[in-house]
Regions:
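Catalytic palm active-site di-aspartate
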Residues: 76-99, 104, 124-125
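Short, ordered beta-strand-loop transition motifs
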Residues: 32-34, 84-86, 111
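Short amphipathic C-terminal alpha-helix that caps PH/PH-like domains
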Residues: 61, 137-153
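Short, acidic (Asp/Glu-rich) active-site segment that either coordinates a divalent metal cofactor
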Residues: 106-140
Length: 157
């Protein structure tokens, strides 16, 4: 379950790191909607050693792809063939060349009394969403993407 927390644009990562240090559970999400971008930072707490966190950006990007393209069990946003991953963790669009940035994915690790956590930050370009015809309310889109990232981070890290 995703716990949505609206914050001032530009403070998403700080809010997630602070919440992670204070013991917030996996699924806590700080998000903001700006004119040019939609940004969220999601707390994940995979049950691995910190040295395994290096794979988390790619896993987060795969979660984003599941939500954008769909899987066998969920329809996604219907963007199959329209989006892809640019190594190692950015989401791009603009088939067939895939040269337009849709989202940048970054991960920051942290630790506190509650244990290790990752703050997965995703910055989504509104212009690319428009080009792809994505017409979903901001909070609903963030919640959908964050849930997919959280699900894969618990399975594949």
């Amino acid at each position: 379950m995703i716990e949505m927390n609206a914050v001032v644009a530009g403070t998403e990562l700080d809010a997630a790191r602070d919440a992670g240090r204070e013991g917030a559970s996996a699924g806590w999400c700080a998000w903001s909607a700006g004119d040019a971008s939609l940004t969220f930072s999601l707390i994940v707490r995979p049950d691995v050693n910190m040295h395994a966190f290096h794979g988390l950006p790619f896993v987060a990007a795969m979660g984003m792809m599941d939500a954008l393209v769909g899987t066998a069990s969920t329809p996604g946003l219907g963007l199959a063939g329209k989006v892809g991953i640019q190594w190692s963790s950015d989401i791009v669009c603009g088939a067939p060349a895939f040269e337009t940035s849709l989202a940048r994915v970054a991960v920051n690790g942290g630790a506190a009394a509650a244990g290790m956590f990752g703050a997965v930050t995703v910055d989504i370009e509104r212009s690319a969403l428009g080009e792809l015809g994505v017409d979903v309310a901001d909070e609903a889109l963030v919640e959908t993407l964050a849930a997919a990232v959280l699900a894969l981070s618990l399975i594949h890290i």
